[in-house]
Structures are given as structure tokens and as C-alpha cells.
């Protein structure tokens, strides 16, 4: 049995679950706070629920783009270091940075999706969500999800570019 590979699998599962739950909870609480405090949107509002679901899916999908770069990083780190504890700390540190970067990009993409809808239509999106307009929620949600699908690979490539690959040629 390859202990480093087993450690990689366990770390990946635990990291994905813990960070996934934390990021989705943070996103949900942020949307709930903004909806209630800033825009006075009721909790039983179906349109806001659809909008929230779209944002949660998009954020989760964008942050999932970190998984492959993290696996590459772990393989590189495991060849450099024999100490399991140091390997674990390095992986968690890099992983947190990469996940935070993907989370910030995901929030930006969601904000951009809502901004695009506001720009291309004369409708006040927030007021329509507040009025429980399902059609507006579906269109805005579709824009957000589509932008996430289109930018997912770019985010993965961006994260991949930060991996400290070893030099291929000696200097």
C-alpha cells in the first residue's frame, strides 16, 4: 500500500467535504444576510431561493476547479518532502490559498452575472426578486450558471499556474 497515496485520498476527501460545506455555508449566509438586511427580502421568497440556488451551484462548481491543481500540487510536494506532517501542513496551506482564490473569482462571476442582467434590461432585478418574480430569478440564475460553466476551465488553469513546479532544466 502506498501511504502517500492513501494520505492524498483521505486529505482530498476531508478537504473537499470541509471546505465545500464551509464555502457553501458562508455563501448562503452572505446571501441571506444581504437579502434580508440590505434588500428586506423575505425568507419564503421563491425567486430569491432560485437565485440563491444558482449562486450556490456556481460557487460550488467554480471552487471544484481547484481539485485537479491540488492533486498535482500534492504529487509535487510528496516527491520533495518525506515528513508526513510537513506535507500535510503544506498541502492544507496551499489548498486554502487556492480555494480562497477560486471562491473570490466565483463571487465575482456571480456578481457579474447579476450586473449583466441589470445592464441589458430595464428591470430592477432586486425589486423583482423582492416581488417574488420567478422569471427574473430563472433568467439571472441561468446567466450566473452559464458564466460559471464558461469560466470554470480558466479558473482551473489560473490555479494551476500557481503550482510551484520544479525546474525542468538545471541552471
How would you label these PLM feature ranges?
Residues 4-22, 90-108, 171:
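Alpha-helical transmembrane segments
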Residues 38-54, 124-139:
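Membrane-interface segments at loop-to-transmembrane junctions
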Amino acid at each position: 500500500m502506498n501511504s502517500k497515496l492513501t494520505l492524498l485520498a483521505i486529505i482530498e476527501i476531508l478537504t473537499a467535504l470541509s471546505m465545500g460545506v464551509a464555502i457553501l455555508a458562508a455563501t448562503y449566509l452572505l446571501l441571506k444576510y444581504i437579502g434580508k438586511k440590505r434588500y428586506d427580502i423575505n425568507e419564503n421568497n421563491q425567486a430569491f431561493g432560485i437565485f440563491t440556488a444558482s449562486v450556490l451551484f456556481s460557487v460550488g462548481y467554480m471552487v471544484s476547479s481547484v481539485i485537479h491543481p491540488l492533486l498535482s500540487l500534492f504529487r509535487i510536494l510528496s516527491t520533495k518532502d518525506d515528513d508526513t506532517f510537513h506535507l500535510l501542513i503544506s498541502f492544507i496551506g496551499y489548498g486554502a490559498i487556492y480555494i480562497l482564490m477560486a471562491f473570490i473569482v466565483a463571487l465575482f462571476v456571480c456578481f457579474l452575472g447579476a450586473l449583466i442582467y441589470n445592464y441589458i434590461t430595464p428591470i430592477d432585478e432586486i425589486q423583482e426578486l423582492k416581488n417574488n418574480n420567478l422569471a427574473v430569478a430563472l433568467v439571472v440564475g441561468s446567466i450566473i450558471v452559464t458564466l460559471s460553466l464558461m469560466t470554470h476551465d480558466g479558473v482551473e488553469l489560473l490555479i494551476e499556474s500557481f503550482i510551484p513546479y520544479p525546474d525542468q532544466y538545471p541552471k
